[in-house]
């Protein structure tokens, strides 16, 4: 096929094609020179007319020649009209040939721009190429511009108003931060100033978005203002409600009561510890857990009514005024446990005729460091003397009393706690007399403890005031 195509092609066209594909710098000049030569010669480079078409102009020319000869020989009017028609025919033939040459030149110029496959098709079927040339070609420049504008609008790169992307020094594109539309400074109403454009801190909104934002703000403010009076009215009765205020008023007395209750509990605990320690024979100072001068003062203060009770109970059981020695012994009461049953039996069986004589050891003097022990012993004496004996007239009341003491430890401890907790019992005048005759060391100790208690009370009152 390639060989047959080459035989059909014109050598001038092949030479022009070689110049077109050559990489030399002079190829363009040679191609232009070849084109000029082909135009001068009138040879067809691409399209060869068919023999029928060639014969038609020859026949027309041959007809015209005899007509011109005849016109020159015959000077008639009819013969004069023939040369005019022949001249018209000549002009038309020249015009046709000129049009054909123009079409051929345009084909030569357009073929290199097309790919090689199209070149082969154009060579094999030149009629189709001519038909394609006759079709109206659309304006590509206008199409490109419209498609670019549409693309810019779709991408949001052009102004919404004028639909253009042109940017000048005083007419730049500004983007709205809400709707993200672009506006030219001049297209937007009101116009955007250069300060707004150049300020990087500015968040710019278009006129439409600013209106919408103002409407939304007004709508939000109206419902927020309406429920405010109702909220105030709902709050006011809660503040005036007495049920709410009552617990607040009671809060302060509660705190005071809790403090006073704490003090009372401390006193009760100390008395209970002292009574239990008297039953178990262990000193209350080690069992109570209260250390320091406060615990020491509480114990000695409670020891005063114990002595008064002891004196009155011993006087009531015996029916005689107590002797000085017995009062001193019971008032001091720091002795050991074996000496207690003897003293109890003496006081219980004083009214009977038979008297049991039990040798009593002399009691040791009062020691300042063992005040807890003396208090426990005195409470023991009170509980034992306060218990009713089953047979007061019999001499064997000691054994029954001891059995009762073994079985009624709970009652004796309760009685001891009651005696120690009551601070309002007045001291017997006979007891005061016996105390005056007693040793001065005990009185001085009691006075010192009273002073210490007063100091403690004053300190506690100052703390409460603060």
UniProtKB/Swiss-Prot annotation:
It is found in: Nucleus. It holds the Pfam family PHD. GO terms for cellular component: INTAC complex. Residues 453-466 have a biased composition (Basic residues). A zinc finger (PHD-type) spans 156-212. Component of the integrator complex, a multiprotein complex that terminates RNA polymerase II (Pol II) transcription in the promoter-proximal region of genes. GO terms for biological process: RNA polymerase II transcription initiation surveillance. Belongs to the Integrator subunit 12 family. The keyword Metal-binding applies. Keywords: Metal-binding, Nucleus, Zinc, Zinc-finger. Component of the Integrator complex, composed of core subunits INTS1, INTS2, INTS3, INTS4, INTS5, INTS6, INTS7, INTS8, INTS9/RC74, INTS10, INTS11/CPSF3L, INTS12, INTS13, INTS14 and INTS15. The core complex associates with protein phosphatase 2A subunits PPP2CA and PPP2R1A, to form the Integrator-PP2A (INTAC) complex. Residues 218-233, 311-329, 374-386 have a biased composition (Polar residues). This is Integrator complex subunit 12. It comes from Xenopus tropicalis. SMART domains: PHD. Residues 41-101, 216-251, 311-466 are annotated as: Disordered. Residues 69-84, 338-373, 392-423 have a biased composition (Low complexity). It comes from the Eukaryota.
């Amino acid at each position: 096929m390639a060989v047959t195509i080459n035989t059909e092609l014109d050598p001038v066209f092949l030479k022009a094609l070689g110049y077109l594909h050559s990489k030399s710098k002079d190829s363009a000049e040679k191609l232009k020179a070849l084109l000029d030569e082909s135009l001068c010669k009138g040879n067809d480079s691409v399209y060869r007319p068919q023999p029928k078409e060639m014969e038609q102009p020859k026949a027309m020319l041959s007809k015209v020649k005899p007509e011109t000869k005849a016109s020159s020989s015959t000077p008639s009017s009819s013969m004069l009209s023939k040369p005019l028609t022949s001249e018209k025919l000549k002009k038309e033939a020249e015009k046709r040939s000129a049009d054909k040459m123009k079409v051929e030149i345009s084909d030569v110029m357009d073929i290199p721009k097309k790919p090689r496959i199209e070149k082969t098709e154009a060579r094999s079927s030149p009629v189709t190429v001519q038909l394609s040339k006759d079709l109206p070609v659309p304006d590509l420049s206008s199409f490109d511009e419209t498609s670019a504008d549409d693309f810019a609008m779709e991408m949001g790169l052009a102004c919404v108003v004028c639909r253009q992307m042109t940017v000048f020094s005083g007419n730049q594109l500004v983007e709205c931060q809400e709707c993200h539309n672009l506006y030219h400074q001049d297209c937007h109403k009101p116009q955007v100033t250069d300060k707004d454009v150049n300020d990087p801190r500015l968040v710019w909104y278009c006129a439409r978005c600013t209106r919408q934002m103002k409407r939304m703000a007004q709508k939000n403010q109206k419902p927020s203002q309406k429920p405010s009076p109702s909220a105030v009215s709902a709050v006011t009765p809660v503040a005036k409600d007495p049920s709410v205020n009552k617990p607040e008023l009671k809060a302060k007395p509660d705190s005071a009561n809790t403090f006073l209750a704490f003090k009372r509990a401390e006193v009760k605990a100390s008395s209970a510890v002292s009574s239990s320690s008297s039953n178990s024979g262990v000193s209350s100072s080690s069992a109570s857990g209260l250390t320091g001068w406060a615990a020491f003062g509480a114990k000695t203060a409670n020891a005063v009514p114990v002595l008064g009770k002891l004196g009155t109970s011993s006087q009531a059981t015996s029916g005689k005024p107590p002797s000085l020695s017995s009062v001193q012994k019971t008032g001091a009461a720091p002795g050991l446990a074996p000496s207690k049953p003897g003293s109890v039996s003496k006081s219980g069986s004083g009214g009977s005729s038979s008297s049991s004589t039990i040798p009593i050891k002399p009691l040791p003097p009062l020691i300042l460091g063992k005040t807890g022990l003396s208090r426990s012993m005195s409470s023991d004496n009170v509980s034992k003397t306060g218990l009713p004996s089953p047979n007061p007239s019999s001499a064997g009341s000691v054994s029954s009393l001891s059995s009762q003491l073994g079985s009624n430890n709970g009652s004796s401890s309760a009685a001891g706690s009651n005696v120690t907790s009551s601070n309002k019992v007045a001291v017997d005048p006979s007891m005061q007399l016996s105390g005056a005759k007693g040793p001065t060391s005990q009185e001085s100790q009691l006075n010192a403890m009273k002073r210490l208690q007063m100091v403690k009370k004053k300190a506690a009152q100052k703390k409460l005031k603060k």
